[in-house]
């Protein structure tokens, strides 16, 4: 199995207040070259509900609400989009990313991202684990995801 390198840059600027970290982009996200691109992933739907707006330009939405997006993993082996299959992990330099920003809190989307963050990343910013919005976590109702992610909206104020 060959190593796959994360194919696109973080969404971040100096005014970012929160950083949302996934594990590694899905096959569809890698093809579409942006975060949470699989239409079955509920991340963007949750954001629309929390911020009470339709999101047409995802990157502009993130900048407008001071949200940075990235993934913990810089490169890895992976089968399809399954976090369970991830191996040979190299992590992104998250501490350097947030140096010249207003980021005061980091959220991870799912257990794998949180576990890898805790294991590999040395950063003084508080981190909060949130449930995965992936279709692999379909048992979690949309209302429950929105409730769990409310802290993101509150942290963007």
Predicted regions and their residues:
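A polyampholytic, Gly/Pro-enriched intrinsically disordered region
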Residues: 146-157
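A polyanion-binding, active-site-adjacent surface
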Residues: 2-105, 111-116, 120, 124-138, ...
């Amino acid at each position: 199995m060959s190593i796959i390198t994360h194919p696109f840059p973080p969404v971040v600027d100096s005014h970012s207040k929160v950083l949302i970290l996934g594990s590694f982009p899905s096959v569809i996200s890698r093809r579409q070259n942006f975060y949470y691109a699989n239409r079955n992933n509920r991340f963007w739907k949750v954001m629309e509900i929390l911020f009470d707006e339709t999101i047409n330009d995802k990157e502009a939405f993130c900048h407008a609400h001071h949200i940075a997006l990235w993934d913990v993993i810089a490169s890895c082996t992976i089968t399809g989009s399954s976090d369970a299959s991830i191996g040979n992990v190299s992590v992104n330099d998250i501490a350097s990313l947030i140096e010249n920003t207003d980021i005061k809190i980091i959220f991870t989307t799912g257990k794998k991202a949180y576990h890898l963050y805790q294991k590999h990343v040395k950063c003084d910013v508080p981190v909060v684990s949130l449930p995965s919005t992936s279709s692999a976590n379909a048992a979690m109702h949309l209302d429950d995801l929105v409730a769990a992610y409310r802290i993101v909206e509150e942290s963007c104020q």
